[in-house]
Amino acid sequence: MPLSETMYCAQQINIPPALPNMLKQFTKAAIRTQPRDVLQWAADYFSALSKGQDLPVKKRLELPVATQKTDTGLTPGLLKILHQQLTSKETVTKDELLPKWKALHLPVEQLDTILALGNFSENINWMQFFALACSALGGSITSALKHACEILTEDPEGGPAQIPFHMFRSLYTYLAHLDGEIPEEQIDSFLHSLEGQAQSQGGMVQPSNFTSLHTAEK
């Protein structure tokens, strides 16, 4: 004789008050992030949530980047997640970076390429790594800096994407010196021109200040 199914009435089912909103936020996060492995991403999501860590969640849904050769790889949204998770540290180790990179299902080969380009040792300067990662998104120095502004800004989406001049100067100087083909006087001239604009903008720089300048890169 088959076992009868246990029947419950509504009064017997106790739904934790926080559960509906938690599941709603999880669903919205999954839709925005579009993880390739939903099960693994869900494990990473709830693990971070239980530890009070930054969640591996994109701020908005990203359309595929047309210039990418494949449908995998770093995107501005994923880089922003990494930055939110690691920006509190001036330096990180590969052992700290690798799990977070893998949690976003990014190719390890791309991470190794960025680390090799920066010639990083065991301790990785996070903002230098961030600058190179922006280069991986855009290719040119100007494109990399534009991505950096859009990721680092506290302006709302669609705003001018301003960042402090001192932060911009550090990113640009690092990339320009790493490039090795931009004369020092050209670097100084570009920064001097941009500093004047920043002073009239409360010490802030935005992409429209430099995307029209040809002195940003050779």
UniProtKB/Swiss-Prot annotation:
Location of the region described as Disordered in the Swiss-Prot/TrEMBL record: 199-218
GO biological process: spermatid development
Top-level taxon of the source organism: Eukaryota
Localization terms from the record: Cell projection, Cilium, Flagellum; Cell projection, Cilium
Residue ranges annotated for the RIIa domain, each copy included: 17-54
Major location category of this protein: other
Alphabetical keyword list: Cell projection, Cilium, Flagellum
SUPFAM superfamilies on file: Dimerization-anchoring domain of cAMP-dependent PK regulatory subunit
GO cellular component, as recorded: motile cilium; radial spoke
UniProt keyword Cell wall biogenesis/degradation present: no
Protein task: Functions as part of axonemal radial spoke complexes that play an important part in the motility of sperm and cilia. Important for male fertility. Involved in fibrous sheath integrity and sperm motility, plays a role in PKA-dependent signaling processes required for spermatozoa capacitation.
Binding partners and assembly: Component of axonemal radial spoke complexes.
Family to which this protein belongs: Belongs to the ropporin family.
Identification of the protein by name: Ropporin-1-like protein
UniProt source species: Danio rerio
Gene that encodes it: ropn1l
